[in-house]
């Protein structure tokens, strides 16, 4: 290689080495300078580095979507819906959970509020649902230790108490008793209390002598009130008089053929079985052949037929007539499901009422449910064949076969 070429390559190598040394120096200098980041980006970086904060943000977003977007996919949901019988309920999915020991030996089931009471043919009482009564500290699942399990004949559930009658005619009550749900006036005075004029105390006659079981036509409970109707029309009524606008009228009323409680009124069927007694003129003087149908005067609709049974919800009543027809009075929500139109050879043999719905059983063994469906009260399961008895809770229905086995249940589970 010529001296000229050697000189050229030598100079080139020196330049490359200088360039490499300069780049290394610049890189070292740059490393000593802190990277400039915008304040917003710094906030985001700090937040994303905290796993707990990120998790909380994700949870907040999910809650927002559930609250504001979820209802768009829930057509039955209403943020304005309230029900006085369903207040102060802790989380539960047991509202329709019939105990296993009762499922194949059902004599009767009854419910009014957040819990349901059942009775087996062997005379044992069972209670399920949300059994703790609000903030009272009372739990209706605490059945009295001296209750003669295996010897109970009838049971009924109120909003916060239970009434039972044993085979000897003795009446048993438990639950909340602060507003006269049970307990005689003499017991209050003996305990040093004062008589409350707004309470109709448990009749002393019943406390002393009980009832003749074969003469009991109906045992029923309402909102902090209870009643026993005898076959001869005698009505024993006790509880919180402030809960019903016509309580005193029924205390003084004569014989009744049938009676029941709505949320605000006591309703009765007179001895002639051709009208509804409430003590308020015009309250139930008209009836409808179906939910939402045009009202007609009750005398016109009956046309010689008589009332066999009265069944109630919170705001309405259903009358089962002597020919198996059913008509209605009172208030229904605008979205209520209508009762089905039965064929000429089909009629109702039983109807039970919940808080806002009815369930009916026909002579053909078909079961139908109608009324408000906001909590799936009318969402019947497919298997409802072979049914011979029906029972109702506040937002539940129960179908039982001729062997007293539970066929199906539906409605609000929790």
What are the roles of these predicted feature ranges?
Residues 2-131, 135, 151-158, 252-259, ...:
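Gly/Trp-centered helix-boundary motif
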Residues 152-154, 216-218, 253-264, 306-309, ...:
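Repeated scaffold domains used in trafficking and secretory/extracellular systems
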